[in-house]
């Protein structure tokens, strides 16, 4: 196999992986539309996961609390991959995480796909909890 065909194979594999991720993401979006009546964006999905992980439903959250909930979501999503671990909760019930290893260098699209992949894994492992 020459290096040209090897490079083409790698490009094809990357495209297939992205296409598979996109299809799985569309399937998740469709199930969330069915559940909530509209298509949530990535931030809304992170917010919902944050509420799920926080475990307390409130009438309203402040802007800072909403950001904290999205941070909880990201830490919870990346914990199974070894990036974070739960250290405990404070007196108000807010979870606190410790970063175990740095995030890989990624551009914005790669970061979004990285998060989407972890969100899909979360929904696979916590089916029907949102």
Which sequence ranges carry the predicted segments?
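Amphipathic protein-protein interaction modules
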Residues: 61-111
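N-terminal low-complexity, intrinsically disordered segments
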Residues: 15-54
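Helix-rich interaction surfaces within compact, conserved domain-sized segments
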Residues: 102-129
